[in-house]
């Protein structure tokens, strides 16, 4: 039987990558559960755009750090949608600050958001998919820092490394149930979290990236939409890097730095 996804949940879809992903999945014919943490107006705007595409949208507040509430929100959205075929774990953020300045509370705050919340969310989604007996797609939005470090972001980097490992282990265990699990690892993307709007991508020059600009949210969303589609049926446990070639510049870029400014968290 060909996988025909009709119902998706995208966490943190009030703006940026999450919003673009919700719209891309709606364009692919899916009804979408839209979630927000602090920007209800943004989530309602995303939902309205989904509806303009002729698809159903359900909006719910979602706090990935409130681990007891996470399963209930996902189950509620799935029930309202009539089931769950695609789950996109997009909620995340934070840096944690320089390593020597961190305390355990700061560490737990970032790891709790990016890894604990992701585990509970994806576990809930996978359980719903497995119990339905139907195929499913789980996609985690990670980061290029899931494989490479970043000064001033020890907790963030550790949490994203952990999330990449979780994705790969889930892929091993869930494949026989018809559930694929993949990650999409963005580089610098023109989103509000980076103090940019999508239109800033074309007007911002990044000489250290082979494609010398930030990415657009839609360029991440298009890859997520592929992984959520029937066309990705034999793809699982993979990390899809969408970074304009940033990760290819390691030694060459490092050898051309002309100051020690990179050593500061700023």
What annotation goes with each model-predicted range?
Residues 98-99, 106-111, 205:
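Substrate-binding pocket helix/loop in short-chain dehydrogenase/reductase
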Residues 127, 172-173, 233:
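Alpha-helical segment proximal to the catalytic Tyr-Lys
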Residues 143:
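Residue(s) in the substrate-gating loop at a strand-loop-helix junction
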Residues 83, 88, 175, 180, ...:
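Short, small/polar-rich loop/turn modules that mediate ligand/substrate recognition or access, typified
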Residues 122, 159, 167:
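Active-site helix of classical SDR
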Residues 176, 183, 191, 203-235, ...:
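C-terminal helical subdomain
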Residues 14-16:
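Conserved glycine-rich cofactor-binding loop
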């Amino acid at each position: 039987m060909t996988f025909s996804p009709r119902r998706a949940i995208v966490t943190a879809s009030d703006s940026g990558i999450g919003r673009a992903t919700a719209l891309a999945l709606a364009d692919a014919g899916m009804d979408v559960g839209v979630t927000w943490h602090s920007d209800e107006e943004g989530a309602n705007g995303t939902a309205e755009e989904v509806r303009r595409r002729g698809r159903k949208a359900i909006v719910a507040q979602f706090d990935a750090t409130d681990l007891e509430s996470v399963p209930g929100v996902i189950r509620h959205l799935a029930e309202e949608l009539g089931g769950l075929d695609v789950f996109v774990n997009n909620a995340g953020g934070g840096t944690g600050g320089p390593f020597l300045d961190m305390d355990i509370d700061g560490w737990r705050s970032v790891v709790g958001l990016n890894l604990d919340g992701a585990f509970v969310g994806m576990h809930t989604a996978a359980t719903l998919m497995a119990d339905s007996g139907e195929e499913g797609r789980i996609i985690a939005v990670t980061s290029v820092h899931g494989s490479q470090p970043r000064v001033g972001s020890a907790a963030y980097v550790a949490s994203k490394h952990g999330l990449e490992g979780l994705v790969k282990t889930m892929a091993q265990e869930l494949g026989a149930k018809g559930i694929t699990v993949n990650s999409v690892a963005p580089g610098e993307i023109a989103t509000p979290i980076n103090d940019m709007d999508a239109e800033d991508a074309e007007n911002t020059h990044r000489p250290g990236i082979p494609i010398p600009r930030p990415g657009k949210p839609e360029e991440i969303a298009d890859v997520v939409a592929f992984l959520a589609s029937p066309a990705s049926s034999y793809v699982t446990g993979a990390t899809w890097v969408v970074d304009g070639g940033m990760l290819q510049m390691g030694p060459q870029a490092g050898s051309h730095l002309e100051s020690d400014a990179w050593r500061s968290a700023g």
